[in-house]
Amino acid sequence: MMKTSAIHSPFEAPNTISLVAGTGDAKNPLNAFDMSLLESGIGNLNLIRISSIMPPKADIIPLPKIPQGSLVPTAYGYQISELKGETVAAGISVAIPKDKELCGLIMEYECIGGKKECEDTVRNMAKEGFEMRGWEIDEIISIASEHTVENIGCAFAAAALWYK
């Protein structure tokens, strides 16, 4: 993991993005959600939920070492279920434009169902978002998680934005 310790203005656009996913199962919904955050590697951060825009020229990197308690801009999806045996999934995709001066799109999706269905859907959402803008896609990167509920289960996927 990269080490990061610089403090940044909340109005400075992040220049990296990391896709993460995890699952959790617990006795209550909040703990199931928390466990999925921990498994994804961002459980000790303060997530600030953002809309689905990737800053132009941001690099997609493995999750860096972010100081605990940091305020981290994050686009995410999650699905929680209390029905034992039910399968839940969450996915995130990032569509990167051919024109590197343009922003990218982050799409999130969650469902009762499997990882493949979820990831296919979230990738198609990214394609549609680019079609609506009339932009050409260079690449789509995605990740998804799937969980079969034992107590109360959660599937989680996110794009965490940070700084080099």
Curated annotation (Swiss-Prot):
Annotated GO biological process: arginine catabolic process
Modified residues (Pyruvic acid (Ser)): 52
Keywords: Decarboxylase, Lyase, Pyruvate
InterPro entries from the UniProt entry: Pyr-dep_his/arg-deCO2ase, Pyr-dep_his/arg-deCO2ase_sand, Pyruvoyl-dep_arg_deCO2ase
Entries under SUPFAM superfamilies matching the protein: Pyruvoyl-dependent histidine and arginine decarboxylases
Cofactor: pyruvate
Superkingdom, natural source: Archaea
Site entry (Cleavage (non-hydrolytic)), positions: 51-52
Transmembrane spans: none
EC number: 4.1.1.19
Signal sequence annotation: none
Gene3D superfamilies in alphabetical order: 3.30.60.30, Pyruvoyl-Dependent Histidine Decarboxylase, subunit B
Cofactor comment text: Binds 1 pyruvoyl group covalently per subunit.
Keyword Ion transport part of the UniProt annotation: no
GO molecular function, one term: arginine decarboxylase activity
Chemical reaction(s) catalysed: L-arginine + H(+) = agmatine + CO2
A Pfam family hit: PvlArgDC
Family: Belongs to the PdaD family.
Protein's name in the database: Pyruvoyl-dependent arginine decarboxylase
Gene designation: pdaD
